[in-house]
Structure formats: C-alpha cells, structure tokens
Amino acid sequence: MLERKKPKTAENQKASEENEITQPGGSSAKPALPCLNFEAVLSPAPALIHSTHSLTNSHAHTGSSDCDISCKGMTERIHSINLHNFSNSVLETLNEQRNRGHFCDVTVRIHGSMLRAHRCVLAAGSPFFQDKLLLGYSDIEIPSVVSVQSVQKLIDFMYSGVLRVSQSEALQILTAASILQIKTVIDECTRIVSQNVGDVFPGIQDSGQDTPRGTPESGTSGQSSDTESGYLQSHPQHSVDRIYSALYACSMQNGSGERSFYSGAVVSHHETALGLPRDHHMEDPSWITRIHERSQQMERYLSTTPETTHCRKQPRPVRIQTLVGNIHIKQEMEDDYDYYGQQRVQILERNESEECTEDTDQAEGTESEPKGESFDSGVSSSIGTEPDSVEQQFGAAAPRDGQAEPAQPEQAAEAPAESSAQPNQLEPGASSPERSNESEMDNTVITVSNSSDKGVLQQPSVNTSIGQPLPSTQLYLRQTETLTSNLRMPLTLTSNTQVIGTAGNTYLPALFTTQPAGSGPKPFLFSLPQPLTGQQTQFVTVSQPGLSTFTAQLPAPQPLASSAGHSTASGQGDKKPYECTLCNKTFTAKQNYVKHMFVHTGEKPHQCSICWRSFSLKDYLIKHMVTHTGVRAYQCSICNKRFTQKSSLNVHMRLHRGEKSYECYICKKKFSHKTLLERHVALHSASNGTPPAGTPPGARAGPPGVVACTEGTTYVCSVCPAKFDQIEQFNDHMRMHVSDG
C-alpha cells in the first residue's frame, strides 16, 4: 500500500534551500562539507591560521592562499595565513623579556650566580628542569660540576635555538647538557668532540706530514667548518669511535688483563669505523706508534706483577688533548715498575710514600695539565679527569682483597702536596670536577666511559672501624665555620656539657614524656645527631627546676589568688598536668604541649607555599596566609565589623557583651582582658601603698588614697591625641584600638 507523499511546507522548503550548496557554475549539489583548497591546507608551512571572517578588503600575507566557497546568493572567501617565522618571533620576544627581567618566575643557581628565566621555556627545553618544576620548585640548584658559562649558553640555546661551541669548550657543554638532559645538544657535542679526533686521517692525505693536523702533538685544530665551529645542524650523526674515551675506559680496569689490547684494538677499530682502507706500506703517525709502545710496556709489567695497588706510581692512561704546546706521552722505564713493586710492599712507611710522590712529579712534569683547565680541554673526560687521584682517597680506607691494614694520614696527604709542587697545577676551583665529585659524593666515585655512553658507579667498601674522616677530603670539603653554626638552642637552656653539632643538620629532641608518681626529678637529654666521624652521641643536660607529680592534688581554689599573674576568676580548678620545664608553662592537652615544644627546639615543620616561610605551628601558618589573601573572613554580627583573625573577633565581642572576667584584687576593678588587668596591677605596684604579699584577699590595704592612686594623673593615648583622667576610661579607649587591629 503506497503512502501518499506529503507536500513540502514553506518552512521545510526554506530549510532545504539553506542547506543546498551550489558550485560557482550554478549546478546544484547535495548538502556536504564546505569545499577547501587542499593545496593550501597541505602546504608544508609550519603554521596555518584559518580566518573565517570576510577579508575581501584586506591583503593577505606573502604565501597565503585563497579558497572560495560559493553559496546561494553569496560568496565567502577564506584566507589561509602562513606565518613562517612565528615560532622564532615568539622565542625572540620571550628572550627580550628575560633580558629585561619581565615575567621571570624561575631562578637557576650555580656557583653562587643566579639566572632568571621562564618556567615554560625551561620545562620545554630540558627534562631536568621539567622534573624540578613539576615538583613545585621555583629555585633550582645546578650541580657544581659545570661552569656558569655552560649553563648560560644552554639557556640561551633554549630561547634562540642557536648554540655556538668551540672545540675547546665542546666537552664542557657536553657535560652541562648531560645534566640538563638536552639530547640534541648531547648528540651534537659528542659528534664535535669525536670529529676532533676523526679529522686527523683526512689530514694525512692532504698535508703529507708525519704528524697530522688536529693531533695532540700538532697543537692545532682540524679543518674548519660550520660543523666544527659548533652550529647545530640536523643531519645524520657519523658513527665515529672515540679513541680518548676507549683508552680512558680501559684505564679504569685497575690493572686487569683487559689493558693488554687497549691500544691496537681501539686504533684498528677507529680506522674501520671511519671507512679508511688500511695501507700496510704507509707508516703510522708517531703518536699512534707511541701508543703501541706503551701497550707493550704495560703487557710486560702485567705479566710480571700479580696484582696492583693504588699508588701515584701506577701508569696513567694516555690522554689525547688539543693544547697549545706539544704533549709527550709518558714513557715508563723498567726500574719504575720495580720501584712500584717495592712501594706496594712498604706502603705504610712515610719515607717511601714521599719518595714515590717526588718521582711521580718528576716523571709527569711534561704530561701534567692544570686541574682547573681540565674542563676546557678538547677531548679530556669531564668527570673522571684524574682517576688515580680520585681512587687514592679510597686506597687507604678500603685496601684490596679485604686487607684490614690501617690507613696512614701521611700517605693520603701527599695528593694535596703534589698539586702545590707542580708549577703548572692550579688549585681546584669551584667548577673543578675533583672538588665537585668528592664534596657531593663521599663514598661513590663516578667515572664516565664515553665508548659505551653510560656512567659507571663504583661503590668502595668503606671500613666501618675507621673513626676519622679521610684526610684527603680536607682539600675539597668546605670546613664548617663553627661547630654549632646551625644549632638553635633555647635562651633558657643552660648546661656545662659541651654541645657538639654537625653543620647543616638540625636536631630534634625527643618529646618529653610524663613522669610517674614517686619518681625523682630526672634531667632531660637533648640528643644530638651522631657526627660522621664516629664519635659518641653528645647530650645536653637540662636539670628540672622541680616538676610536681601529676597525681598530686592542686591547692584548693581561692576566691582571689594571692598572685596577680595567676588570679583568674575562671579555670582555677582545672588540672594542667603537662608543664614545660623550660618556661614553666602548663597545658591541659598533650597535643598543645607537643606544639609548644617546637618553640624551644626551633623546629618549623609548617611552610608557606607562596613565600616559603616556615612556622612552628599550623595556626601561625594559617594566620600568615591572610597576609597573602587579605580576606577578612570573621565578621561581627552586631556591628558588621570584619577581622582577619578569629581571636580578634572574640576580643571585639567582649565589648558588646560587656564581659569583664578579670578583676583587680586591690581595687575590685574588672577588666575584659588579662593584659589590661596586668597593666592595671602594674600601676598599683608602682605606688607606695602596695599591700604586702601576705595580705588576705578582699582586705583594704593602706589608706583610702591607695584606691584612688591614679587621681590627678592624665592618661594620653599613644595612637590618637585623646586624654583621660580615669584609668578605666583610658583602658576602654585602648581596647578600641586593639579591636581595630
């Protein structure tokens, strides 16, 4: 059965006409998505901004494309605006704001210097900064392994995308980029450092000299190009093995048999990686020949010596560097190895130790480099520059093969003496790798093997019986100014016991527990942290002035107390079993007593998240937060006056209620606040007619003039110029100022 087709109404017909889209030629089409110019959409522009407004009278940017959408009765043109340098202009604007100090919300600290930057840029450019900022840090400390200039260049690179690195500072930038985890800079600096060694083989065919350009002995750098000057470009990284890293990694094997092939295998692998055919008729350069000779000498030594120990006489790994002068690789003689064996037997004697150091200084006179310049060297290692000097610290503390022979301070002290004996040696500065490694990691030595691109951690077994720190660390560790520089003690704490604290550590005394009935007075012990030198824990003895037992009944409450300080009309019969032995303040609740002890110990566990200010109590932190918010949350229901603190509102409400709970025991005058009562009693104490302490409460002491002792006196307000003849009026007036905050 066929259904009758309903005629189109006027509304349906109008809606269908609006949905129809006609082509420019006038042919009708079914309702579909608007036609877009796919050539404009799929153009390889970095950014496309589609504007849906009618821009018929405006001119498009260079490189913009138009798309016409023809509808029935009207034609709308969509412009595709392509901003090629939009990202660069945004970074340039951010960099200008950083240079002017505008909107910088992060402080980067290194070696006492501060660098201000934007957290969004740092988080986008460095995973290291991103992790710190996600934890809520606004003040980030960079490890002192790198210099300020390296971090400054990397931050400039995040804002500009351009990094200019010279051959001498490539290794230093590589170390800083490794800490900040900037992968692109790490890859490029690694390639630059490797190319410094890799370019020596093309130099052989060009120059024809025995010593190629770019080798350590030439004293010159390789061929100059944009890549070597440090411009970071996106091109495939060449797989070039690094000779200096492989030799350095083999040197950390501590005399194992793996050193036997550290020369020939590495050099041959380097030639294979470069894709250079090996010409047997062409002689090797002189610096490679010396490496082979060094390898043969070490093989002979390892075959005759069963084991080795850490001594300054131990042969060093070859360090390939680009310096101004020529470098002669140290040649060890056979008598040096014989002397090294004698030194291993007589290591406990100081004379042999000094002789070992003197011979080492003479033999290394042509090889030594300033420790302060080890970061700026072309191809040297960034962290493990002096492996023997670093391992020397633990040679005395942890002997080989579990030997428990004691360490001699004279032997460990020879390492600082050597640095002063050499003419070209510099004192390790704040950016020196030796100082940073030994100050930050007491029992860990980190060595970097660039051949595997991974850090190797060595955990030496520290002898627990040693009761004094290593003498060699005195050169690098900062001495504390005073032993109790960071030790905060209450002013009322007096003791004859010597207080010893470790700088940088705060102490937290154990919470005072209540004493059972019948026990005599016992001194409290403030336990300080045990120092690293193995000394016994020091205590500060605080004798109790006489703490009454908590089970004893307090004296019966009197209508008027004999002491003005404790004369309160309410709360006299309440027990307060928790008494502070330092200030004799009592508490009814243990939690209030525990909070009170933070005042004496100096502990401030509550910290403001805005200004990082710390407070001992949470209530103080809540009151402090009002200074940031400025909200007056407490309002009086009678006069609609607002207060920032609830305590201020409570004091204000006493004025409306007319409460005067505090009464003077002399003149029977009542006050609404304890402070006003104490001030009033002080006026009585200053007069000559003060009743003695044993006068019973309620008795009229002295002549009638004592009560009116304030007659004839004018009281002037210190806030406003108001004057009063009566102390009561003056006190009421002062309460108004107190309630106003």
From Swiss-Prot:
Sites bearing Phosphoserine, chain numbering = S353
Q: Where is the composition biased (Polar residues)?
A: 206-235
UniProtKB keywords: DNA-binding, Isopeptide bond, Metal-binding, Nucleus, Phosphoprotein, Repeat, Transcription, Transcription regulation, Ubl conjugation, Zinc, Zinc-finger
A GO CC annotation given for this chain: cytoplasm
Q: Which tissues and organs express this gene's product?
A: Specifically expressed in early hippocampal neurons, cerebellar granule cells and gliogenic progenitors as well as in differentiated glia. Expressed in adult and aged myogenic satellite cells.
In chain numbering, cross-link Glycyl lysine isopeptide (Lys-Gly) (interchain with G-Cter in SUMO2) is at K330, K371, K723
Q: Which domain of life is it from?
A: Eukaryota
Would you tell me the protein name for this molecule?
Zinc finger and BTB domain-containing protein 20
Gene transcribed to yield this protein: Zbtb20
